[in-house]
UniProtKB/Swiss-Prot annotation:
Residues 4-6 are annotated as: Ser-Xaa-Pro motif, crucial for potent interaction with nAChR. It comes from Conus textile (Cloth-of-gold cone). Belongs to the conotoxin A superfamily. GO terms for cellular component: extracellular region; host cell postsynaptic membrane. This is Alpha-conotoxin Tx1C. The cysteine framework is I (CC-C-C). Alpha4/7 pattern. The keyword Secreted applies. The modification Cysteine amide is found at C16. Alpha-conotoxins act on postsynaptic membranes, they bind to the nicotinic acetylcholine receptors (nAChR) and thus inhibit them. Expressed by the venom duct. GO terms for molecular function: acetylcholine receptor inhibitor activity; ion channel regulator activity; toxin activity. The keyword Transcription does not apply. It is found in: Secreted. Keywords: Acetylcholine receptor inhibiting toxin, Amidation, Disulfide bond, Ion channel impairing toxin, Neurotoxin, Postsynaptic neurotoxin, Secreted, Toxin.
Length: 16
């Protein structure tokens, strides 16, 4: 999911 992808974590810190 999103939180397993570093760029996605960086772009969505509120959900990760």
């Amino acid at each position: 999911g999103c939180c397993s992808r570093p760029p996605c974590i960086a772009n969505n810190p509120d959900i990760c």
